[in-house]
């Protein structure tokens, strides 16, 4: 019997009622009004800029529409217009399993709210998440893909769920070396990732603002580090809040794939450019992924895949919180063998 926690993965979802936000753009510094509206099945996440002429103001949230990755993820459209800082909202949609929504903003940037995704998550949950009765597809990673830029690298590996493993290493005393690894589900996302805030360094602020960036940044919407120490009076929400925010960003950037990814994202010192380049590399090689119906995977209908071998959703539901490393390894080995059969891999194909 399939665990009840997995049922939401079978079909697409939207929100049950509209949501409104008023906030500041992190980089533009402009006041922004944003509304999020329910949307029909198979429409995906779309954005509209209400300050632009009709017919030129629509943006589609897809990997190949990204046109800027400096300090945020920026979408563009065929008319040459841009919409910046979409990653935190996309992360919230993805983390909660929302496939379809229409977002309207009255400026060039999504509001930063408190620098995390938690205000979005809270509002989306309060609005209600509504199933649409339409099957959901998943993008299953078949073969590893990896990209490296200097000391930074990122890769996607076959796995039973969306798992993120991120490491960062900063010389600032209050950051240092931090690592995080977890399966992503609505529960784990809301509890462990969504409230982690973006961060910046006091020594960079003047230079960024000269370039028209970080004009709306403050300790109200970011962690500020000064001389290596956290300057925010309230301190950190997690001891490793910095790497948790990197995971939050990665989930938002990966949400630009054409369907929710089932695979293991691993990265060292990632950024928005690295994440988007990884998606571009993935999509350029059709051997590295397969688009499948979520229900078929969950029900074991694809070449006899047993539903218990593809525990999508909660890490506790997959292994149990007290499962030993040896048992985990045995389960993963069994799962990988099943996945090889499902995807038609032979021993010679296995990376």
Predicted feature residues:
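C-terminal regulatory domains involved in ligand/effector binding and gene-expression control
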Residues: 1-100, 104-351
């Amino acid at each position: 019997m399939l665990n009840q926690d997995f049922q939401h993965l079978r079909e697409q979802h939207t929100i049950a009622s509209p949501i409104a936000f008023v906030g500041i753009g992190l980089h533009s510094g402009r006041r922004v009004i944003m509304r999020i509206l329910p949307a029909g099945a198979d429409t995906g996440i779309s954005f509209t800029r209400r300050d632009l002429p009709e017919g030129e103001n629509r943006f589609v949230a897809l990997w190949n529409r990204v046109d800027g990755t400096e300090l945020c993820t920026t979408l563009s459209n065929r008319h040459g217009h841009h919409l910046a800082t979409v990653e935190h909202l996309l992360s919230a949609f993805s983390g909660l399993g929302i496939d379809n929504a229409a977002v309207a903003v009255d400026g060039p940037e999504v509001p930063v709210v408190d620098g995390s995704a938690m205000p979005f998550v809270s509002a989306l949950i309060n609005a209600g998440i509504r199933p649409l009765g339409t099957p959901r597809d998943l993008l299953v990673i078949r073969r590893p893909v990896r990209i490296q830029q200097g000391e930074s690298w990122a890769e996607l590996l076959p796995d039973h769920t969306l798992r993120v493993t991120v490491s960062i290493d900063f010389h600032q005393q209050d950051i240092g070396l931090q690592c995080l690894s977890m399966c992503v589900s609505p529960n784990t996302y809301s509890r462990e990732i969504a409230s982690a805030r973006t961060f910046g360094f006091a020594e960079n602020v003047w230079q960024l603002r000269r370039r028209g960036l970080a004009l709306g940044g403050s300790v109200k919407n970011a962690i500020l580090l000064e001389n290596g120490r956290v300057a925010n009076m309230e301190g950190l929400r997690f001891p490793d809040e910095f790497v948790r925010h990197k995971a939050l960003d990665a989930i938002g950037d990966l949400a630009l794939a054409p369907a929710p990814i089932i695979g293991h994202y691993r990265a060292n010192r990632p950024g928005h450019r690295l994440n988007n380049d990884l998606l571009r590399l993935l999509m350029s090689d059709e051997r590295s992924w397969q688009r499948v119906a979520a229900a078929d995977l969950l029900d074991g209908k694809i070449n006899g895949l047993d539903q218990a071998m593809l525990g999508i959703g909660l890490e506790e539901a997959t292994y149990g919180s007290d499962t030993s490393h040896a048992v985990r390894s045995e389960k993963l080995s069994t799962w990988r063998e099943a996945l090889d059969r499902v995807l038609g891999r032979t021993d010679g194909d296995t990376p």
